[in-house]
Amino acid sequence: MTIIAISIMNVVIGIAILGVILRKKIMPNQKFQRIFILGVQGILIVLSGIMLIGCEGTDIINRISPYINMVTVYSNNVNINIGYSIDGISAIFIFLTIILILSCNLISIRVIKEKTEQKFQIMLLLTEILIINFFAATDLVQLYIVYEATLIPMVIMIGVWGSRTEKKIAAFQILIYTLIGSIFMLMSIGILYSTLGTTDYIMIREYIDVLPENVRKLIFIGFFIGFAVKIPIAPLHLWLLRAHVEAPTAGSVLLAGILLKLGGYGYIRYNIGLFPDLCEYYFPIIGGICLISILYTGIATLTQLDVKRIVAYSSISHMNVIVLGLFSGVLQGIEGGIILMIGHGVVSGGLFLCIGVIYDRCKTRIVYAYNNLVHVMPIMAILFFLLVLGNIAFPITSNFVGELLIFIGLIKKNIIIAFFSALSMIVTAIYSFWLYNRIFFVNEIIKREANEVISSKGQIVADMNALFLIEDVMKKKEERGIDDIGQPKEVKKEQLIYSDVNIFEFTSISLMVIMMIIIGMKPSVVEGFIAINCLELISK
């Protein structure tokens, strides 16, 4: 049933893409097209729910195992088997992908211009079908092709719908970084095919131990570097910062919410799944690199002014904590890493949704330009606060469960690495609450600029509310001739919108908050799908 569901998903998304392309003939009304797209996402959610039910308590290791609840269908082409297999881990990531795409559809209704909305929806659907096929792939060549193809719609989204002047540079940078990393991944696949004569994942798992130790190490390093770019691990993280700053809201949500998880999923399948002994061997090196990344990005976050860069650095820090958990080789660490990947997907995705809404209203992302928005956007203030709690791993949130399990696993593995990685929680709490306070409450820098404005107007204003401050502080920014990243920019008064979230924005952000709380309050919802897989990873 699970493979039938994945096949139907591909057909449904294909029909949706065709429907969007032919919308002028089939759906001349823009409203009907949006209803059609949302209906497609609803069908996909139902199908992914069926997969989740069918995959609970399954693994991908042995096709004829009584624990397997799947069917694998192959078509042979040049000795490369192309097929699909779904287990608990891949099913839950597919579900996350569909939820995030739905949120992107909802958040883009207002901000994407009508004349380009058709092309934008096609890019979202292409991203969705490629990511779903990545998580369901059983062949390494199939996986590599889909892995690379996910770049195409993302590069187009950033290059065409990006919000800044350097969007084309960002699109080129993400392309170059990922392609260079993929060379190492392709090298590992080539070695596997030349030595074992197959690229089928199940067959490789069965015979991987017969390879010489040096060959196995070379394959391991190739996969590690290839997926490290996507995580990303410092110093391979530079592409992500520019990509987030330049990307449209939906692009940032997909980058943080699911595309970074391709690297984590790759580690689970092709590093930990194939070489658990080498994970143990290289853990001190991997742990040291991740610790440097965690501490560096945490401290760097405190120096940022662009709110997107703040969340981007936070995202890198969390992903490196995930890598520590996955490579710990301890059951709790691996389970925590997977749960935190899901939690990070909804929390960071939700934060980027919030930032996109605020940017749509205020036309700036520089943190000092915001002040007292709680009076103008009270609902947004509540949603943002809940997501901040998730970002700092507050109890009853998904990130709390994931980080707790990771640190339990790290304590069992290496107490020193566990101690220093735990410092990231303190740093995360500092910049998360600092960011929230800067956006929604009064800060001293804005007070000084506001007082200058008040003095120049000769007015006495007791309540320096957000409506007044956004307009006049932005005028002062215009006088100084700077924008979010130090480049000339003109912000017109008529561009500013003073309103809280609309129904589409509220729904998209609420989906993230609800998933975060459900996983946090009942982690067994996720553990039921991944437990057998994690046990298998540590027992190989």
From Swiss-Prot:
UniProt catalytic activity: a ubiquinone + NADH + 5 H(+)(in) = a ubiquinol + NAD(+) + 4 H(+)(out)
Coiled-coil stretches: none
InterPro entries documented for this protein: NADH_Q_OxRdtase_chainM/4, NADH_UbQ_OxRdtase, ND/Mrp_TM
Keyword Phosphoprotein found: no
Main location: mitochondrion
Secretion signal span: none
GO terms for biological process, alphabetical: aerobic respiration; ATP synthesis coupled electron transport; electron transport coupled proton transport
Pfam families named in the record: Proton_antipo_M (PF00361)
Domain of life: Eukaryota
A Gene Ontology term for the protein's cellular component: mitochondrial membrane
Membrane topology: Multi-pass membrane protein
Residue ranges of the TM segments: 2-22, 35-55, 89-109, 118-138, 140-160, 172-192, 218-238, 248-268, 282-302, 310-330, 338-358, 376-396, 415-435, 501-521
EC number: 7.1.1.2
Subcellular location field: Mitochondrion membrane
Keyword annotations: Electron transport, Membrane, Mitochondrion, NAD, Respiratory chain, Translocase, Transmembrane, Transmembrane helix, Transport, Ubiquinone
GO molecular function, one term: ubiquinone binding
Family of the protein in this entry: Belongs to the complex I subunit 4 family.
Described function: Core subunit of the mitochondrial membrane respiratory chain NADH dehydrogenase (Complex I) that is believed to belong to the minimal assembly required for catalysis. Complex I functions in the transfer of electrons from NADH to the respiratory chain. The immediate electron acceptor for the enzyme is believed to be ubiquinone.
Protein name per UniProt: NADH-ubiquinone oxidoreductase chain 4
Natural source organism: Dictyostelium discoideum
